[in-house]
Curated annotation (Swiss-Prot):
UniProt GO molecular function: ADP binding; ATP binding; proton-transporting ATP synthase activity, rotational mechanism
Predominant localisation class: mitochondrion
Identification of the protein by name: ATP synthase subunit alpha, mitochondrial
Site note Required for activity, residues: 373
Protein species of origin: Phaseolus vulgaris
GO cellular component: mitochondrial inner membrane; proton-transporting ATP synthase complex
Keyword DNA repair: no
Complexes and interactors: F-type ATPases have 2 components, CF(1) - the catalytic core - and CF(0) - the membrane proton channel. CF(1) has five subunits: alpha(3), beta(3), gamma(1), delta(1), epsilon(1). CF(0) has three main subunits: a, b and c.
């Protein structure tokens, strides 16, 4: 009896020990580094790994599995590969790449993995979102119908942008592409201060890809001085960061913007610029020995950008009515918009703002080529009052460009042609705008209405900026605010009387 009771005790003890043993038991799938170099590691042994899964090297550096082959796995390293040696252990994390998202991110500067780099400590309350997700389906979307104002007269009047649109900013280096993007962020300050509900507020995400660190620091300073950092998130993968981080940064920024889109809020995301992301992806693909195609880019470089930009959308009322607006930037070489990456992104987006070096050096800033710039869906989102004010603006500018080319030959011009040249020069002058000085929409309507209706026709060109400042500062505030509601016949009479009176002081 004594023996059997002791046996029972022993059995119970063994069972409890074994139960506790298995609760602390963890299985990790590991592999070994076969070769490493140029930020690419070939790893043998990770047979169950998923595409896009994060792995961790023995040195603590992380990487992402991009090539799944029979013999080994091609892993791109997020960081320096100098500490990784042949034969090192590599551990699966079991998770696809994800980043932090939420309102806790506002006002912060983070890297492509969402790690803060602004020296202000760890992130507070946030959720995590996968960087690669499917874009919203057709049924979940709604057509673009709400305006997303940039504060730039040339853009809001001629190439209007709506919430949920993708509008490309394209041009050579040093033509003011980033300036348009920054002005758009700064313009949201006054828009957000007037917002009465969450659905009117627009949050901004700026993704810097392959830029100098000094440029990013300068941008942070500009935004903080204008108090625009409080509604903005900056994602920076600078020129000194490895190519995999430059490739990943736009997707990380997009995941952060999608938090607002999917929670019934509105966000704007700027990718500055996608040319550098394509170059980083080409570098990675060639090192992974993927077959090169046109301009040595891999065959799926179109999909690289299309799957990113399709995530910008206006959601239907049933799915929260949120939106994500995208302003991708592409840098051209010597104005060649027919190169591989520019044509790809032009075909994906809903329109483009084309900037030209020649216009920039002639002092026309923003240097927008009105003939080549187009917004395919934005006119549905443009305010009725702005449509009324613009009237024949685009047509007159097109006729002016056509006639100006012939006028250079110095032949005698008839009165109608002379009037057309005169009007075109003044319209061009009115559309000029200094950097970091976005205008509210009602002020834009006032200035454009004055120019289109001929109140500037008899003024010297150098007097127009002065006239513009004068009418903006002396107009009755109630008349100015009423312009947003549309130009009724009574308002037109009052407005024209005011503009005519002011124009007398500046005419020849």
């Amino acid at each position: 009896m004594e023996f059997s009771s002791r046996a029972a005790e022993l059995t119970t003890l063994l069972e409890s020990r074994m139960t506790n043993f298995y609760t602390n038991f963890q299985v990790d799938e590991i592999g070994r580094v076969v070769s490493v170099g140029d930020g690419i590691a070939r790893v043998y042994g990770l047979n169950e790994i998923q595409a896009g899964e994060m792995v961790e090297f023995a040195s603590g550096v992380k990487g992402i599995a991009l090539n799944l082959e029979n013999e080994n796995v091609g892993i791109v390293v997020f960081g320096s590969d100098t500490a990784i040696k042949e034969g090192d252990l590599v551990k699966r994390t079991g998770s696809i790449v994800d980043v932090p998202a939420g309102k806790a991110m506002l006002g912060r500067v983070v890297d492509a993995l969402g790690v803060p780099i602004d020296g202000r400590g760890a992130l507070s309350d946030h959720e995590r979102r996968r960087v690669e997700v499917k874009a919203p389906g057709i049924i979940e979307r709604k057509s673009v119908h709400e305006p997303m104002q940039t504060g730039l007269k040339a853009v809001d009047s001629l190439v209007p942008i709506g919430r949920g649109q993708r509008e490309l900013i394209i041009g050579d280096r040093q033509t003011g592409k980033t300036a348009i993007a920054i002005d758009t962020i700064l313009n949201q300050k006054q828009m957000n201060s007037r917002a009465t509900s969450e659905s009117e507020t627009l949050y901004c995400v700026y993704v810097a890809i392959g830029q100098k660190r000094s440029t990013v620091a300068q941008l942070v300073q500009i935004l903080s001085e204008a108090n625009a950092l409080e509604y903005s998130i900056l994602v920076a993968a600078t020129a000194s960061d490895p190519a995999p981080l430059q490739f990943l940064a736009p997707y990380s920024g997009c995941a952060m913007g999608e938090y607002f889109r999917d929670n019934g809020m509105h966000a704007l995301i700027i990718y500055d610029d996608l040319s550098k992301q394509a170059v980083a992806y080409r570098q990675m693909s060639l090192l992974l020995r993927r077959p090169p195609g046109r301009e040595a880019f891999p065959g799926d470089v179109f999909y690289l950008h299309s799957r990113l930009l399709e995530r910008a959308a206006k959601r239907s009322d049933q799915t929260g009515a949120g939106s994500l607006t995208a302003l991708p930037v592409i840098e051209t070489q010597a104005g060649d918009v027919s190169a591989y990456i520019p044509t790809n992104v032009i075909s994906i987006t809903d329109g483009q703002i084309c900037l030209e070096t020649e216009l920039f050096y002639r002092g026309i800033r923003p240097a927008i080529n009105v003939g080549l710039s187009v917004s395919r869906v934005g006119s549905a989102a443009q305010l009725k009052a702005m449509k009324q004010a613009c009237g024949s603006l685009k047509l007159e500018l097109a006729q002016y460009r056509e006639v100006a080319a012939f006028a250079q030959f110095g032949s005698d011009l008839d009165a109608a042609t002379q009037a057309l040249l005169n009007r075109g020069a003044r319209l061009t002058e009115v559309l000029k705008q200094p950097q970091y000085a976005p205008l509210p929409i009602e002020k834009q309507i006032l200035v454009i209405y004055a120019a289109v209706n001929g109140f500037c026709d008899r003024m010297p060109l150098d007097k127009i900026p002065q006239y513009e400042r004068d009418i903006l500062t002396t107009i009755k505030p109630e008349l100015l605010q009423s312009l947003k509601g549309g130009l009724t016949s009574e308002r037109k009479i009052e407005l024209e009387k005011f503009l005519k009176e002011k124009a007398k002081n500046y005419t020849l």
